[in-house]
A protein has these predicted regions:
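Conserved short histidine dyad/triad with adjacent acidic residue
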Residues: 13-17, 32-47, 154-173, 207
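Short histidine-centered beta-strand/loop micro-motifs
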Residues: 20-23, 41-47, 88-90, 142-143, ...
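Short, conserved beta-strand element in jelly-roll/cupin
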Residues: 35-36, 46-62, 155-159, 172-188
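Short acidic-glycine-tyrosine-enriched beta hairpin
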Residues: 66-81, 192-207
């Protein structure tokens, strides 16, 4: 089965981009890209499912159940279920560019307006990629943070000439990979077929397909990856 590859440039500039939607039949998550202009906000709402958000650029304030949390580029945010939340662009750093990941169960809808009911009061988890260390490994958000369905990995810089899993020519597993390319260009090999991927691409690698990443350019490639929570500890 071929991977799904869709870029933010495939959508009108500045408009929300549903890069991986329920119509694509993902097994795990949907992925959307959005821009919050200075002085603007995200949607203000509350719902039964969790959000994970990664801020690509900009800074502002996450308001969760009335409490304010500063957020900035490189931050991963886990917003637990039933938390009233909105993100303001009040950081003075231009547009906020971000991706938002939801479990497939969210496709049924039923988000309600913010302020319409009490929130659960569960605090969000906010972690910057600069805070990763030997203990956390590449895991930005995972089971230790209360994530119920999927985890977020920050793959770091894949340097020119680097190849993933060189000893086996790649790997495969029973869960979906959902990947967003933050910077650079590389090659994704799926079941022997090569696909060029570049900054702004959202990629879904179907379960069980043998796959490998390569950087055959002269600049680093950066990615964030979303996997089923059951993959935790499997690399």
């Amino acid at each position: 089965m071929e991977p799904l590859i869709r870029n933010i440039k495939d959508f009108p500039a500045g408009a929300p981009a549903r890069l991986i939607s329920a119509d694509d039949n993902p097994a795990l998550v949907t992925l959307a890209y959005s821009v919050i202009e200075p002085g603007g906000t995200s949607s203000h709402h509350i719902h039964e499912w969790e959000h994970e958000v990664y801020i690509i650029e900009g800074s502002g304030t996450l308001v969760a159940d009335g409490k304010e949390y500063p957020v900035k580029a490189g931050d991963a945010m886990f917003i637990p279920p039933m938390v009233d939340h909105v993100t303001r662009n009040d950081g003075g750093d231009g547009n906020i560019r971000r991706i938002e990941i939801n479990p497939i169960s969210a496709a049924s809808g039923n988000a309600r307006p913010g302020g319409s009911e009490p929130g659960a009061g569960t605090p969000p988890v906010i972690r910057n990629h600069a805070d990763l260390n030997a203990e956390t490994g590449h895991t930005m958000l995972g089971g230790r943070d209360g994530c119920p369905n999927y985890l977020m990995l920050y793959n770091g810089a894949m340097q020119p000439g680097a190849v993933s899993h060189p000893e086996t020519g790649g790997h495969n597993h029973e869960w979906d990979h959902t990947v967003f390319v933050l910077e650079g260009t590389g090659t994704l090999v799926v079941s022997g077929t090569e696909y060029t991927v570049t900054a702004g691409d959202a990629i879904r690698v179907p379960p069980v397909e043998h796959h490998q990443w390569k950087n055959e350019t002269d600049a680093p490639m950066l990615r964030v990856t979303f996997n089923d929570i059951k993959s935790e500890g499997h690399g």
